Amino acid sequence: MADFLLGVNYWPRRSAMYMWERFDLGEIREDMARIKGLGLGIVRFFLSWDTFAPSIDTIDTRALGDFEAMLGAIGDAGLQAMPTLFCGHMSGVNWLPAWSLDPATPHGRFRTIAGGAASPYGIGDFYAGERLLAAQELFARRVGERARDHPALYAWDLGNEFSNLREPRAPADAAAWSSRLTSALHETSEAPVTAGTHGEDLERDRHLRPSSIARPWAFATMHGYPVYSAFSRGRLDADVVPFLMQVMQSCSDKRVLFSELGNPTCPPDTVSPYDRVPLPGEPPLPAGALPPNAAAYACLTEAEMADYAYAVIDRVHARGGLGALWWCWADYDAALATLPPFDRAQHELHFGIVRNDGSLKPVAQALQRMASEQRSVLPAPPAIVSEAAYYASLPSGIEHDYRRYCQRQTTG
């Protein structure tokens, strides 16, 4: 059987989502060596759409050169790479080229940043609008030409939680988008293709169907966090992630790489006041009577995080996952705290396996321990839901399905 993949999602701790504007190959090479030193095998990283495509018919040559250098740094460290295109949605913000925006579309619950400034507009219909589809094909072809079949290239990811940019009008639009961009990448690269679906795609009907959107993919992916999941039993709930994985596996009939999992870490000497982080557009949680050392957001202590990481990845492996990629490599430099997305989401500074001074957290040792076990992918278990019935039951049905799932895990 194939090796069970372990890796991280990557932004540098000194620049975070501003990596391509402040590209520091030395820092990247240092980080890749440390990731490899932990025994991890794969790095997922993100191409800023605004940086790479300054106009609708132009792909920036300097950015393409930096992309090649990034692939080289990953490969030189003995790691595999999973580039994510059209980014797009990231950490509660939609980072978009100005030319992709539609003045008739308000930005919705996620704010838009275009050209470094906030915009009141959201993206046009990138699933079905010919103008935006052609621009995405150009991006895919040009990036694919640069990478081709680079020895470090594990797979392409079509987008990070792309439904947060805009929901498709119908599942057929999302399926056609997926097929068209997969074909564009395969013109120059034989690497597998997937795309970053996430928990909210399974919590309500967002006009995506795994069976159709995942049809051209080599495997499906899923993202999930107990602090963001409305059906979670709490911030330490280690069954949320494997449940989402098995629902995706059941509906798509594809094996699943869990390409984002994690939780925010509590600042030193604080405890979590809540079990959930409200999503953009949701009301704040009631303050109530909080302990004097309460953090400002739902979080896990460093010790809790290490235990959670091992437990949740163990479940992903046991229930047929292809692997798990932790979100994320590093806590970010405090100097970034006043910039988007952190100015409105301080918890986003604290998801890393290394602190913002570069020192390792206990969760890094937990991942290293898991990697040292050199596990292989296990056979997929039977389906736990049928796609048609599952989507017909949303949004309320997920609570029932999850409780039943947890009971089965307890009783065997």
Regions found by a protein language model. Name each.
Residues 215-239, 280-295, 354-389, 410-411:
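Glycan-recognition surfaces
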Residues 172-182, 189-292, 310-317, 322, ...:
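Glycoside hydrolase catalytic-domain groove-lining segments
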Residues 19, 104-119, 308, 316, ...:
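Aromatic-rich peripheral "rim/lid" segments of glycoside hydrolase catalytic domains that contact
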Residues 133, 289-292, 343-347:
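Short acidic (Asp/Glu) and glycine-rich catalytic loops that position anionic groups and cofactors
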Residues 1-217, 223, 231, 251, ...:
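Active-site mouth of glycoside hydrolases
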Residues 108-115, 119-123, 271-299:
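A solvent-exposed, charged loop/short amphipathic helix patch at secondary-structure junctions
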